[in-house]
Amino acid sequence: MYSIRLELGRELEDHLFRRMQAKEEEEERAAQEYRQKKSWLLRKIGKLSIHLGFLAGILIFAFADHSSYEKLKALEEEIAARPFIYDALPLVDFRVLDEAREEAAQLEELKKTQYYAVENDDTAGMDEEVISKYGIVIDMNENTILATREGKTRISPASMTKIMTVLVAAENIAEDALEDKFTVTPEINYYCYSHGCSKVGFEDNETVTVADLFYGTILPSGADAAISLATYVAGSQEAFVDLMNQKLETLGLSETAHFTNCVGLYAEDHYCTCYDMAMILRAAVANPFCREVLSTRKYTTTSTDQHPNGIEISNWFLRRAEDKPIGGTITCAKTGFVKESGNCAASYATDDKGCDLIVVTGMSTSSWRCIYDHISLYRKYMPGFDPSTADSAAETAEAEGDDEDN
């Protein structure tokens, strides 16, 4: 009996040993399979990394200088001469060079219609002496945001809207259209009076030139000129506003900006950011005629029966800022005011060394304070400004003014 038990014990022990051995072998096979799959995956990742890195290099190279196509071809030949690299890229189709070249050309076309600026490590806030609640300073050459204060927060642009009005109009008329005539209707004047808009002063049924409408829209911020210009271009203000919103889309601003009128009247759906307005001004400055209109200090409309000597109009911002040293020159500007926006303005300044800056501010406490915010910001970021040239005491007293401009 004892020997039988001993034999059974040995058999059980052998059985358990074989099971343990089989389990260990199974685990070893699983581990080996895992290592093989891991090794295979790492090789694939390595090849893919080389592949993607190579393609990225080609794209970066092509976008940096898409005109140097021969250099790209030389790069292709160099890669092909290295079998260990080429073998790692069995799926590379070097037609990607042609595609990259085409995409680079498309990018160049895009640059003609879209503008941008980005923040970097040097982007600053604004000093306490800047009163405006909202603001942004853009370096046009470097495409950087030098300073911002809620620069991408939605605001009511008020009459800064008219920068877009003249830009869209300029892009939708013939080159010889400036001498065309347009008759200002009683309905247009009634719209201006009923909405409390600023006006050039055109009378009912007064016939003026299209050029008068451009200058009248910007210099005195004339709603009569703006609506007349919109009607001349598109047949109605409503149709013209559609063109304005299409232009926002072209500029890449349609997600944060939308317009409902060409004048700048407050509406819940009429909005943009300081950044958006800076990009709109940048596009306008790039248009030769818009730049001319925005930089004109004084203008006299053509003679009409109602105004034989024309109407003398002026750019209020430029005239007030022209004797304030900033280390450069404020070349273009447009102000705005509605209750919801406070005093706001968009301006462009340059110096003789090629520095090009745009400043947009919103919600200042007065028209003079608004201007001095721009002057203060230009003085900080224009490299050539000499503080000894500023009369701080006189400017502080002047800034106490509290008039409003639409």
Where are these regions (language model features)?
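Short amphipathic alpha-helical segments that mediate assembly, nucleic-acid/protein binding
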Residues: M1, G9-E13, K38, S68, ...
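N-terminal targeting leaders characterized by basic, low-complexity, disordered sequences
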Residues: M1-R35
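Active-site-adjacent loops and short helices of periplasmic peptidoglycan-processing enzymes
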Residues: H15, L89-Y275, A284-V285
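Short, Lys/Arg-rich cytosolic juxtamembrane segment immediately N-terminal
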Residues: A30-G46
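Compositionally biased, charge-rich terminal segments
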Residues: A30-Y34, A64, A74
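Hydrophobic membrane-insertion alpha-helices, especially the h-region
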Residues: K47-F63
